Amino acid sequence: MIRSVQVEDAAQIRDLCHQALGYDSSLEKVATQIEKFNMPDSGHFCFVYEEDQSGKILGYVEAEVYESLYSDPGLNVLGLAVFPSAQGRGIGRQLMERVEELAKSRHSTFIRLNSASHRKEAHVFYERIGYDGNKTQKRFLKIMD
């Protein structure tokens, strides 16, 4: 079942981010972010795939409203993760379909996402579900003290 993320999901989301994406974060950080994202008009959306039998979260997708001066409104997928042991079962596809439903309901004209250049399997997945890898970019980051 796909549903909106809840603060009670924070520990499972933290573990999922670590195992599927290699990101480490504290339980407090994940819980705080979920609380912020679930506030009205936050512009963030996060859905989880919860296994019916066990209640275990097997995947999640996170998106935000993307608006700029030069484009129509869209959605930006910030993260999609499925536990490695649950990959290949259609969970990622279902989560992305939920984002597509959201985009249609919000009259978004596109969905965009970035995927690290070394994540070749992810690229194949996105292309298989209809996304076009049409741009190569270099990301610049400045850590603020």
Predicted regions and their residues:
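Acetyl-CoA-dependent GNAT
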Residues: 4-11, 15-73, 78, 134
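Hydrophobic adenine-recognition pocket in adenosine-nucleotide-binding enzymes
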Residues: 5, 80-82, 115, 131
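Alpha-helical interaction/dimerization surfaces of two-component signaling modules
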Residues: 16-20, 102, 125, 129
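Short coil/turn motifs at secondary-structure junctions
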Residues: 65-68, 82-85, 118-120, 145
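Short coil/turn segments at alpha/beta junctions that flank glycine-rich nucleotide-binding fingerprints
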Residues: 73, 89, 105-109
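Conserved acetyl-CoA-binding loop-helix of GNAT-fold acetyltransferases
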Residues: 79-82, 88-101, 128
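Conserved active-site alpha-helix within GNAT-family acetyltransferase domains
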Residues: 93, 105, 117-136, 142
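Conserved GNAT acetyl-CoA-binding A-motif
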Residues: 96, 103-115
